[in-house]
């Protein structure tokens, strides 16, 4: 504030006005306890330490035993030099600056800056959006884009119809999940059935909305499969304790496990939902990331099959399915786009959801546009098709190659057990740590897998997440890693670290 402005305020208060002791600042104890209790390990203590080391590398690179930080803690491909899809970025460039379209299509195409189909898609999207991505959209999302999503779901599910009225365009899948949970978590007796291990968004949301976590454990020995009998037992135990199992979270393909659910398993999950009136939230953001001869089955497709086969038995199942532009081949994490499809909900619940979504006006409009590009990429015969197809194939092959290489590396190491990758972007190997390492972690006051991950980071620059951040069976220890980082040197570095670690702490 300038001296003149200070003088202007000089006579505002009397001596009596200023005769008080200034109140203290708010402290942590004044905050929402749901926030203070919530944990999100993906950006927790180890990634925070990685950021500190990254700054140290800039200032004093010679003091650390590595040259770079490998962010294997989060599924963020473009941070790790994955090239964006050309068609996507061409359309986005035009949407951001539609004056480009004042130049004729032929002239623009001759400059090799934009393909004709990118120009046409951008024109269609601008027309659907209303002329500018800087304007708010409908709270449920741009109607034309919702129609494109509905068409995609219909194709994906073998002709089972989807309608734009059931689609909400969202700011990523995370915002869809938290919006749904804020609506469905009525009180402290609401139970959320959450797979363990799980993506920590869900346990964090349970804390935020004061709900009860009802964990159901995945079976590691059978490739992290889901056991419906285990889920039903958790439901029955909760009911005995006067807890209402209201929401069942399913992550398919799994995060952090990479497991892909079979059609039969999904059917059994739907049966539990039908019997107990439990709403299913099916997190399907990795549906394109499928490896090694397994097949993705959407929850909605299986539910529709059951409704046809057993009339009346599954008609009341309420399902919200989530998808995102952050994964698959788009990997546009920073654009913040996604969708949810809701089916089986009554009109009064739909009205409440619409009101909730309207409070935040609308999702990011550029993110909505990228959703359109995700569900309707260039098709055979389009000018961009071959380039787009080749770029997607390259991403897929590189990801699958690194996934299998990392898996094979883990298989040959002492004290590490790993299930074969089926999907998603992660491996979740089990650590069988020497007693000496367990004692050292206890001395330091941290979990054994956190001790391992911290040692890995400090020795190699590889940033991972301890399994304790995702939940795991008591007495077991894991680490979650992506396989997104380019090259293979970091995998060799990890192998050498692991061998040295076990040599140091072997009983």
From Swiss-Prot:
InterPro entries, per database record: ALAT1/2-like, Aminotransferase_I/II_large, PyrdxlP-dep_Trfase, PyrdxlP-dep_Trfase_major, PyrdxlP-dep_Trfase_small
Family note: Belongs to the class-I pyridoxal-phosphate-dependent aminotransferase family. Alanine aminotransferase subfamily.
Organism this protein belongs to: Saccharomyces cerevisiae (strain ATCC 204508 / S288c) (Baker's yeast)
Miscellaneous information on this protein: Present with 3480 molecules/cell in log phase SD medium.
Residues that coordinate or bind pyridoxal 5'-phosphate: 173-174, 199, 255, 324, 336
N6-(pyridoxal phosphate)lysine modification, residue list: 327
Induction of the gene: Repressed by alanine.
GO MF terms held by the record: L-alanine:2-oxoglutarate aminotransferase activity; pyridoxal phosphate binding
Highest taxon listed in the record's lineage: Eukaryota
Known partners and oligomeric status: Homodimer.
UniProt xrefs under Pfam families: Aminotran_1_2
Keywords in alphabetical order: Aminotransferase, Cytoplasm, Nucleus, Pyridoxal phosphate, Transferase
Subcellular location, record wording: Cytoplasm; Nucleus
The protein's role, per its UniProt record: Inactive alanine aminotransferase. Forms a catalytically active Schiff base with PLP, but lacks alanine transaminase activity, probably due to an altered structural conformation of the dimeric enzyme. This suggests this protein may have a yet undiscovered physiological function.
Single GO BP term: biosynthetic process
A cellular component annotation (GO) from this entry: nucleus
Protein name in the entry: Inactive alanine aminotransferase
Swiss-Prot/TrEMBL cofactor(s): pyridoxal 5'-phosphate
Span of the signal peptide: none
Main location: cytoplasm
């Amino acid at each position: 504030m300038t001296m003149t402005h200070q003088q202007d305020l000089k006579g505002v208060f009397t001596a009596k006005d200023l005769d008080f002791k200034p109140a203290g600042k708010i402290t942590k104890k004044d905050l929402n306890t749901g926030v203070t209790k919530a944990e999100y390990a993906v950006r927790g203590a180890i990634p925070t330490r990685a950021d500190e080391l990254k700054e140290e590398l800039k200032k004093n690179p010679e003091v650390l035993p590595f040259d770079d930080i490998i962010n294997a803690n989060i599924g963020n491909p473009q941070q790790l030099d994955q090239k964006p899809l050309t068609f996507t970025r061409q359309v986005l460039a035009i949407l951001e600056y539609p004056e480009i379209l004042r130049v004729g299509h032929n002239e623009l195409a001759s400059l090799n800056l934009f393909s004709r189909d990118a120009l046409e898609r951008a024109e269609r999207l601008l027309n659907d959006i209303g002329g500018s991505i800087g304007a708010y959209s409908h709270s449920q999302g741009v109607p034309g884009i919702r129609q494109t999503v509905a068409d995609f779901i219909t194709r994906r599910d073998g002709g089972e119809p989807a309608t734009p009225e059931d689609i909400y365009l969202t700011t990523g899948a995370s915002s869809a999940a938290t919006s749904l949970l804020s609506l469905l978590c009525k009180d402290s007796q609401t139970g959320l059935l959450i797979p363990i291990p799980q993506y920590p968004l869900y346990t964090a949301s349970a804390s935020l909305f004061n709900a009860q976590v009802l964990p159901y454990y995945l079976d590691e020995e059978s490739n992290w499969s889901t056991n419906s009998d285990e889920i039903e037992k958790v439901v029955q135990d909760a009911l005995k304790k006067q807890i209402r199992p209201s929401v069942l979270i399913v992550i398919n393909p799994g995060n952090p496990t990479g497991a892909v659910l079979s059609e039969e398993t999904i059917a059994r999950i739907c049966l539990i939902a039908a019997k107990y009136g439990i709403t299913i939230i099916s997190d399907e953001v990795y549906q394109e990331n499928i490896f090694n001869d397994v097949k993705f089955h959407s929850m909605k497709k299986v539910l529709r099959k059951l409704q046809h086969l057993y009339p009346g038995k599954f008609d009341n199942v309420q399902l919200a399915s989530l998808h995102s532009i952050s994964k698959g081949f788009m990997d546009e994490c920073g654009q913040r786009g996604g969708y949810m499809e809701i089916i089986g909900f009554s009109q009064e619940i739909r009205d409440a959801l619409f009101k909730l979504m309207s409070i935040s006006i609308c999702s990011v409009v550029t993110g909505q546009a990228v959703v359109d590009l995700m569900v309707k990429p260039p098709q055979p015969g389009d000018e961009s098709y071959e380039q787009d197809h080749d770029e997607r194939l390259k991403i897929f092959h590189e990801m699958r190659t690194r996934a299998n290489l990392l898996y094979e590396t883990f298989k040959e190491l002492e004290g590490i057990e790993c299930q074969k990758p089926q999907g998603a972007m992660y491996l979740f190997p089990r650590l069988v740590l020497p007693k000496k390492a367990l004692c050292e972690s206890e001395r330091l006051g941290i979990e054994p897998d956190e001790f391992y991950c911290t040692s890995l980071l400090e020795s190699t620059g590889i940033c991972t997440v301890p399994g304790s951040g995702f939940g795991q069976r008591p007495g077991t220890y894991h680490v979650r890693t992506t396989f997104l980082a380019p090259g293979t040197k970091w995998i060799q570095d990890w192998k050498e670290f692991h061998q040295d670690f076990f040599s140091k702490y072997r009983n």
